[in-house]
Amino acid sequence: MNNFLKRPIAHRGLFDNINIVENTLASFNNAIDNDYAIELDVVMSKDHEAVVFHDYDLKRLANKNLQIKDLTSQELRDILLLDTDSSIPTLDEVLYAVNGKTPLMIEIKSGNHPFIEERLTEILKSYDGPVCVKSFDINTVKWFKINAPFIKYGLIGSDL
């Protein structure tokens, strides 16, 4: 875990939500350029792709009353965020762009897909950079402990 503690962590990338939108390739490249580690969020699309987005819907960042789980990764890629040229990347695209240049902390939003853990394991087992997964869902964290102990994992806590 030392790789994750050596530098500040850019939560959802390094962004201002004006010119650079959170959880986009632009925000992650900005974090890398400024020597930050990256925290990002993953949800599943209709076609079972792991896409990088914090919310379960598009209301806040695209002003659309649509659910992520109801759209394919291509449909999501075609939606521009906050009047910029940025769209919702897949986790594969982010891993390719980051390419081990900085540590990644992946928050799993497990509420929208029952097999998100399996899909993330498939994707992450071939990634060579420093990476860990985390979740508020203890069952998700237990799943990684039992089924993918080679991936670092952690539980996120909150006030009751």
Listing of model-derived features with the role each one plays in the protein:
Residues 1-160:
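Phosphate-group recognition and catalysis centered on beta-loop-alpha active-site segments
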